[in-house]
Amino acid sequence: MKKTAFLLALLLAAVFILPADAATYEAEGLFRLRYDEAAYTLDDQTYAYESETGASRWFFVLYNDEMTFDMSLLRMENDAGLTLSTAAEERRQSYLKELLDWYQDEDASLLETVEAGDGQTPFWVLGLRNEFGPYLMAETVIDGNAIDLQAYYNDSSLAADERLQEALREMLAGFEQDGETPVLEK
């Protein structure tokens, strides 16, 4: 009886919790991101040619009629080896200060820290505004690589509100570190 109840509960959880149209984007050696393929269109080709070599790498945009998520990486020579999930609290705070200083021209403010779906990757979520309008950015660092996930409404007149922030949290819930160092040519 207990086994039957457990299996029924597991089946119900799978039906109601897991997206029916789950897809996975994989940045080999770095991370995987599960997302709802029915809700978002993936474009991982448009800017791929711009990041084949060098210190930066564009991964993709996920978008629908209302909002867009844009993910990229920047290798930080001065922070080689830094991983936020394993860094001492003092180092994490000094990096956060550097990050906020870097984006001061975009009125950066720390909104929250979100633990990714793997339970081991902290992302700082910043509220920002540039010449294109308001947006959110979630950033973490893995082995000296800053990984950014930007979120914005396609209508740039809309504020980066709680609804957009919740959509960003949901996207981060599908993030999982791969645990290996990505290979980027200089």
Describe each model-derived feature in a short phrase.
Residues 30, 86, 90, 158-166:
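Soluble non-cytosolic domains of exported or imported proteins
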Residues 22-57:
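N-terminal "mature-domain start" segment
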Residues 39, 146-186:
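Surface-exposed amphipathic alpha-helical segments
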Residues 8-15:
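Bacterial N-terminal signal peptides
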